[in-house]
Regions:
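RNase H catalytic domain
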Residues: 50-55, 93-161, 166
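Flexible, low-complexity interdomain linkers flanking nucleic-acid-processing modules
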Residues: 166-176
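Basic, amphipathic N-terminal segments that precede the first structured/catalytic domain
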Residues: 3-47
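Loop-to-helix element that buttresses phosphate recognition and phosphoryl-transfer chemistry
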Residues: 87, 91
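Secreted/luminal cysteine- and crosslink-motif detector
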Residues: 16-17, 61, 140
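RNase H-like nuclease fold core
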Residues: 33-86, 97-102
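Short, motif-level signal for alpha-helix interfacial/capping segments enriched in acidic residues
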Residues: 26-30, 92, 132
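Intrinsic-disorder/low-complexity loop/linker signature
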Residues: 5, 56, 68-69, 141, ...
Length: 176
């Protein structure tokens, strides 16, 4: 999963240039999360989410906040073979990679609404264990952590649904 490199067009206004970024999507934090974010002014907070349907289509959403303001958003869809927790772990790992490449000098908090990614001590399946291991390895490389956030408070939730819808629309157009 590679955010920000494979899926953005060169003309997109969301690319980071000297701190001047424009969000691609409208993303907002709830009022109580904004107060929590105020304590993290030196941090980059990345909200991630993934949506998976029963046909193996997935949508991913990402919203990056600095000081409570969205500075970057992205959503896209793709095919996925595997479970939803595994997908969410891969999305978290991709967000950590994006932060390391685009914002290498920021402390990073990745927030996901998938509790098993954050809380699993010994993941059940091999594929999920590998995905969680990828997340933990990326967290060891610096000031990077992954934390739980409720789905209701996750601004990336709607972006993931939007990414899933965009994939469905692309497949309908391709079939026509």
């Amino acid at each position: 999963m590679r955010w920000g490199q494979t899926y953005l067009q060169p003309t997109d206004t969301t690319c980071c240039a000297q701190g001047l970024t424009t969000p691609q999507h409208h993303a907002r934090l709830s009022a109580n999360l904004f107060l929590e974010e105020c304590d993290l002014r030196e941090c980059l907070v990345i909200y991630v989410d993934a949506a998976l349907d029963r046909n193996g289509r997935a949508g991913c959403g990402l919203a990056v906040f600095v000081r409570g303001r969205a500075v970057y958003t992205e959503s896209f869809g793709f095919s996925h073979i595997g479970g939803s927790a595994q997908l969410e772990a891969h999305v978290c790992a991709g967000a950590l990679d994006l932060a390391a490449s685009r914002w290498p000098y920021h402390r990073v908090i990745v927030r996901t609404d998938c509790a098993p990614v954050v809380r699993s001590r010994m993941p059940s399946s091999d594929s999920f264990r590998i995905a969680v291991h990828e997340v933990r390895e990326r967290c060891r490389r610096g000031w990077r952590v992954v934390r739980y956030v409720s789905r209701k408070a996750n601004p990336a939730h709607e972006l993931a649904r939007e990414g899933l819808k965009s994939l469905s629309r692309q497949q309908v157009l391709a079939a026509a």
